[in-house]
Amino acid sequence: MKRRWSVVQLVLSLCLVLLVAGAVAGLRPDRGSIQRDQAYRQMTERKMPVAIAKHMKRLQSLPGLEGEHPEGPGSAEAEEFLSRAYPNDDIPLAYLDAARSAAARLKGKGFPRGRGRTGTWVTVGPSEALYPATIFRSSFGYVPNRYVAGGRSTALAIDPNCSPGHCRLWIFAAGGGVWRTKNALSGQPNWEFLSGDFGIQSGSSIALDPNDPSGNTLYVGTGEANASGDSAAGVGMYKSTDGGNTWTGPLGASAFAGRAIGSIAVVPGDPSTIYAGTTRGVLGVSSVNGGAVSLIPGAAAWGLYKSTDGGATWTFLHNGAATAAACDTVAEATAVGSPCSLRGVRRVAIDPTNPSIVYAGSYSRGVWRSADGGATWTQINPSLNAADANMRPELAVTTLPNGATRMYIHEGSTGNPSSRLFRSDSVATGVPAFVNLSSSNVADNGYGTHNVCTGQCWYDSFVYTPAGHPDIVYVGGSYSYGENFSNKRGVVLSTDGGVTSTDMTMDATDFLHPNGLHPDQHALVTNPNNPYQFFEVNDGGVMRSSGEFADASANCDARTAFVTLTPTQLARCRQLLSRVPTELVSLNKGLATLQFQSLSVSPFNSNLLQGGTQDNGTWQTPGNPVKWENTMIGDGGQSGFDAADPAFRFHTFFNATPDVNFSGGDMADWNWIGDPIFGTEPQSFYVPIISDPVVSRSMFVGTGHVWRTKTWGMGAMSLAEFREKCNEWFGTFPPGTVCGDWQPLGIPGVAGRLTGTAYGADRTGGFVAAVERATGDATTLWAATQTGRVFISKNVDAEPVTAVTFVRLDSLATNDPNRFVSGIHVDAANPNRAWISYSGFDASTPTTPGHVFEVTYNPLAGTATWVDVSHDFGDIPATDVARDDDTGDLYAATDFGVFVLAAGSTDWQVAAPGMPNVEVAGLTIVPSARKLYAATHGLSAWLLNLP
């Protein structure tokens, strides 16, 4: 049935009211509301709106797709890493060390002075990132209730001396460093940022020293071991003896630099002995670099390390083989037929009854035991699939009343075979017998732990048993989307040793809109005084449970009004929901940890920002430095406004997935315009897409070609028809309808892509990496490709699209680097001049060094001049560039903050005080308002008021 957008919105809102009222009154909804809510339930089946999700599935089945990047290891991260490494295949550790040294040198010079430069970087949030209440999220799908989100958080630790008035909790935000609250049990914990001086803000391990009863001694490992596209490699380990107020480190740089420390264990009774498990790291964090495919020549082998002098020195012990010697070099670990793990050791644990016994879980090599402190090793549980490099075993050990050591193992990879929970009740000696406690049969009690991490175990997985409670075990992973007889089983709890479990993912506060955990789980701890109260970190930050349970099994019967459940499914639903938390509470208020990809600013209000974030969607603020609101779920890529219509917005998810909005970001009004470009050409994971800064309704996007629309993507459709057919939530997407009227500019066909042979035989391939329109005219556009080609078009508005011409500028120079172009800023006064930033390393292109260039095109002579303005910048990959066209000051973003080259100077310096050492993914400048915004990938958004 075709419905107008406004009518549908009204009907669904009314339906929601009726459903809530009916649930309260214990009434069964009428048949009409059931049918409406079946559609409503379908909208929230996944982290994308259902209408577009179904449409994209159809698009993906069409022949000729070549640019779509499936989520999973080896997609975004591989692309981003190769962009940073290009033209090489990898990045030596020496390059990384040189970049850090260069950044430290620049920071040591102080800040620029003169011309009124008194500004300080300030965070503009969000520290209260609000998912507002909406009909588009419910218990049938994604984060069902209003809640405050945080950025991806990967590790946490709780003070052993936790009481209602004083309970310290530490978390590691994936790109946002270490944070602490001293009142984790309060209604609103207060958070402190602790790691501003760390060499990098990425990490995934925190361990308290069990030998310090005060809980003041803790170790944190840098480098995120989760293998996502923005899981940055680390610099080593840091130690604090005062609860995180001060730190020493990095410890073990020779062993850990260029790797990710996924697990740390300090030996009870011997505080000088520490174990650390490392994995292959990822390089960089911004939207133009990174990658889990890296080997990092010059870095130490990944695996298990041991220190016996408090972290001063480290010895390699193990990487999935019986002897250390078999795997103590990268060459051995990567050799064909190697017995070693290709990714490393993800988890280490010490036997609770014998500190000489150590356990290690390594990717694709199962779980191993050493009875002599790591000297020799025996495999005690083989991998589910030794041929799958992503097969990840998580483990937890505990002591049984009889003194034996019990081990739980949660293992999985990309879904085949499905993940499962194992248990052995005697692992310290002999050959342990592990029991598979999981079952794919819904009728079996073991179904609760079946496939908990679905196809993302390489990224989402944990198993945790509270000390002193061996029968209590928590298992975490990712949402089981489409499973209507559970609460998605993101986290499950068993109190009988893993035999049966109940669903902890949503609480009992409401049937349709309970509080819920984010879909992607990473780690969990419990209150030392209550094993049923958990604190959990995920891609949405940190959550806390009430520590009490309620029976929500009646919700299963209510669900049958909306979905069909078999008798077996209904019985399993009642069991899974028979014990759920009475309440789940977000603890994210005060945490500024969102991982922005970029920021856009309204031309009508310099305080009105949008930004896309990793796995937390797109956000908007009218200028509140604390509170932003989510305007679209899922992944968040690029965003923007229109030159003339203040109500217009656009955003992308990933790849070429643009939506447009005509209602100021109202979630109901996002409309798909991606049909001609989604997957049709090679494309970046986050494609460059812009609104024309001068011409209203015009937009440009880069894939293989630069594409253009002059109608906001609507084509000849009226707005009403467009919303009816192409709306993300309600669109009918009828056969024959094309949502989006993008057209490729210039020479058609594969050869005519900006990456193709029509523009030369060199630097071919890849995709368009940057697109920028001049603000001084209506006809000039600059573009660049992944392989370092740079173009200008002087007639980008021409009709037909084949009349648009591009001139390749890099081929007109001899000093331009053959590296990835990360940013373009076009001169507001001269559209033929631009400043271009380069990622990668000078050491990769020694004859053409430089990270920031001033490029001027002479259209009459057909020439271009390239002036390297890097000066003393050093070999630091630049992630973006922005110029203050009023003063001539030039700003460059890096993985170490923002640097400035003052007009007329050859001396790069830190742009301003106030910003910690953090990776900056993008810069957005508003010279007329004297504002420079920085999108950080882990510490939210920042503002520098310009002189």
What are these regions (language model features)?
Residues K2-S13:
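N-terminal Sec-pathway targeting helices
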Residues L12-G22:
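Hydrophobic membrane-insertion alpha-helices, especially the h-region
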Residues P29-P947:
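Beta-propeller blade termini and top-face loops
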Residues A21-D30:
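Bacterial Sec-dependent signal peptides at the C-terminal "C-region" and cleavage site
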